[in-house]
Regions:
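Active-site-proximal segments of metal-dependent phosphoesterases and phosphodiesterases across multiple
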Residues: 77-82, 112, 116-148
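Core catalytic region of metal-dependent phosphoesterases/phosphodiesterases
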Residues: 3-100
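Conserved beta-strand scaffold positions in the cores of enzyme catalytic domains, especially
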Residues: 7, 61, 153, 171-173, ...
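Acidic, His/Gly-rich catalytic cores of divalent-metal-dependent hydrolytic chemistry
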Residues: 165-247
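Beta-strand-turn-beta hairpins that frame and shape the catalytic cleft
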Residues: 1-6, 107-117, 166-170
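Glycine-rich phosphate-binding loop signature in dinucleotide/nucleotide-binding domains
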Residues: 25-29, 55, 110-112, 146-149, ...
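Anionic-ligand binding region
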Residues: 133-172, 186-188
Length: 247
């Protein structure tokens, strides 16, 4: 059983934000780091994957839709997102192979929480949308096939941190490391024996300048300005995601 698990989601290829979180004492001391998807689709994909791969067995990887789309883009099925197509072209074959073999879900035993299921969007789909205010009937549908013993589900995908109870199950979204909605900073979670939503502050100006200088993505500066500065509010994001939540 694991005592402490750090959950990092939606890094989106932003190296300075990832480095800031990995430098957190509680992340460094965690028994395991779980990545809940959308790891590399961004301006520094190779560097992010190399840094995480270098941590070896301390990292548990889960597939996100953007990870799948990188593999698809490299295979000739382009993404509608420009940075994803660019990132797919940067990755080495070994990195693509890693992304291609990531699981949709992982279940781990954590002190105080029991079996915890980790996924990117939902346990059954890597791009399905659920939100903090999703209707109970929809949550019931989404969780219909979960084992009864799984009382905690950790997801990502929407880049907005929350915790809520869903018919006696705890749902945790750690938010996003590299593309936060609602405010700057790198958002993550610490599990065991309870649940803590965390935010790591870092020098956003310096991070934006570094991404612009080090990435060869043509609009690296624009990407960094838009996402590291969190130009999109949580209200903006909820308005975009709501129709995909069946509303």
């Amino acid at each position: 059983m694991l005592n402490r698990v750090a959950v990092l989601s939606d890094i989106h290829g932003v190296l300075p934000a990832l480095e800031a979180v990995l430098a957190e004492p509680d992340v460094a001391a965690a028994d395991l780091i779980v990545l809940t998807g959308d790891i590399a689709a961004g301006p520094q994909p190779v560097q992010v994957l190399d840094l995480l791969a270098g941590l070896g067995d301390r990292v548990c990887w889960v597939r996100g839709n953007a990870d799948r789309e990188l593999v698809e883009a490299r295979a000739g099925r382009p993404s509608p997102i420009e940075v994803s197509n660019w990132a797919a072209g940067q990755l080495r074959d070994d990195q693509l192979e890693r992304l291609a073999t990531l699981p949709l879900t992982v279940t781990l035993e954590i002190d105080g929480l029991g079996p915890v299921l980790f996924c990117h969007a939902t346990p059954r789909d890597d791009e399905e949308v659920v939100l903090v205010d999703t209707r109970m009937a929809r949550w019931t549908e989404v969780f219909a096939d979960l084992p009864a013993g799984v009382r905690t589900v950790v997801c990502g995908h929407t880049h907005m941190p929350f915790t809520r109870l869903v018919d006696r199950r705890l749902v945790v979204n750690p938010g996003s490391i590299g593309m936060p909605y609602g405010g700057p900073g790198a958002h993550w979670a610490l599990l065991g024996p309870g649940v803590q939503l965390r935010r790591t502050d870092f020098d956003v100006d310096a991070a934006c300048a570094r991404v612009a200088a080090e990435s060869t993505f043509p609009d690296a500066a624009g990407f960094a300005d838009e996402y590291l500065r969190s130009r999109h509010s949580d209200a903006d994001a909820l308005a975009v995601f709501a129709p995909r939540d069946g509303r």
